[in-house]
Amino acid sequence: DLRPGNRHCSRDAAAFAEETLRLLPAGRRVKFARFDKGFAGEDFYQFWEQRKIGYVGKLKWTDRLAREVANCRHWTRYVDEDVIIEGIRLIYKATSWNKARLVIVIRKAERYDGDQLQMYDFLWEYEAIVSNLLDWDPIDIWRFYNQRACVENHIKEAKQGFSIHRIPTGSFKVNELDLLLKVMAYNVFERFKADCCEPVDRRHTITRFRQEFFRVAGVIVSHSRQVILRIAESFNKQHVWKRMETRVAQIT
């Protein structure tokens, strides 16, 4: 769902989630949802609750929430090493919510001499997550939320390898088409790796793949009405390249 850049991502978020579920293959059941603080609000939380889908969502750290957390005294320490991680759970109602919900708060700090860091609140880094997973421990909710980061790697590769973040024109429709073509190229590359590449090369990003196979000295020549690419003999992956060529020919 491509939107203008001046529209907040939380606008019509529930409708966006409903469309996403509708596009899933028949019989595919969603058990959990993870989302960052850009997707928030009463309607969005109700969407998952009404469908009995577990969710974890990052919350914006506000002064009101900070005051609520400041009243909490019984933190549970989960990690007690060079970096200390503690957590609490509380029932909290934001001003825009119709009801109170479970909020877990995780705080982290680097260890200093002794245990004096508890005396200085500014040393702690706080994160808040809203959830309906009432029987989960705060640390498990936090770790489960952080597993969403794997999709960020795909977005990063699409940016670095296919420039999906580049806006080429002033036309929304043209830019949408440009983005769709880039996403299609990314998907074709992923399918190409799965069908035509050696197992050791299937984990390569597009940047690594270009470095391994495309940035190679060569010359294009014309002979007998054919265009031929002659690759330098120093290219040490010629046999791998030939096997990929053969697999591509078998597909076409």
Regions found by a protein language model. Give the residues of each.
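Acidic, metal-coordinating catalytic cores used for nucleic-acid/nucleotide bond scission
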Residues: 33-41, 61-63, 173
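Glycine-rich, histidine-containing beta strand-loop boundary motifs that form or position
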Residues: 1-2, 35-36, 57-59
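Electropositive, glycine- and tryptophan-enriched low-complexity nucleic-acid-binding patches
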Residues: 1-27
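An anionic, glycine-rich sequence signature occurring as long contiguous blocks
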Residues: 54-160, 218, 247-252
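Short, surface-exposed basic-aromatic patches at helix termini and helix-loop junctions that form
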Residues: 45-54
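Short, conserved catalytic/metal-binding motifs centered on acidic residues
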Residues: 30-40, 55, 129, 151-158, ...
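A short, flexible helix-boundary coil/loop motif
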Residues: 188-252
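Short amphipathic alpha-helical "interface-anchor" segments enriched in bulky aromatics
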Residues: 138-177, 181, 185-193
